[in-house]
Amino acid sequence: MRHILLILLFCSSTVFASFDMNERMQKTYTHILNLEFDIAKELLHVESNKNPNNGIIILNENYIDFLTILINEDQSYYSNAKDLKIDRLKACKEKDKNSPYYLYVQSEIYLQWAFCHLKFENYTIAAYEFIKAYSLLK
């Protein structure tokens, strides 16, 4: 009986940890908003080593790309980062579906990419991304 209880406890803790907005992730977010991407990337690296299943890592990585694209207006960076979006969304879908962050993170990624597509005048794709973001949250 104890073994079953320990297994259930372990499994539930890993499920709930799939989206963990812990102190390190909050600091990362603050550094991203301050455009201190190098510091944010270091914190993301630490979090990836300590808590590799944390879905908030995916969101914060996407924030870095989103702001880099909007600020630098670099077409090649934009083109390369589009592939990362697909990988990030796939990774999000493997996380805890019962978490309140599950749909939010996916929607936020779509919304950020909608603005990136607008920046480079890809209006049709941007509209699709806006609709996708909205449909996840309604």
Where in this protein do the model-derived segments appear?
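Terminal low-complexity, poorly structured segments
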Residues: 1-5, 40, 55
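Sec-dependent N-terminal signal peptides
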Residues: 3-13
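Bacterial Sec-dependent signal peptides at the C-terminal "C-region" and cleavage site
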Residues: 11-21
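Short coil/linker segments at helix-helix boundaries
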Residues: 19-24, 28-43, 58-138
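Conserved structural position within tetratricopeptide repeats
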Residues: 48-49, 135
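Short solvent-exposed coil/turn linkers within tandem alpha-helical repeat scaffolds
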Residues: 50-53, 95-96
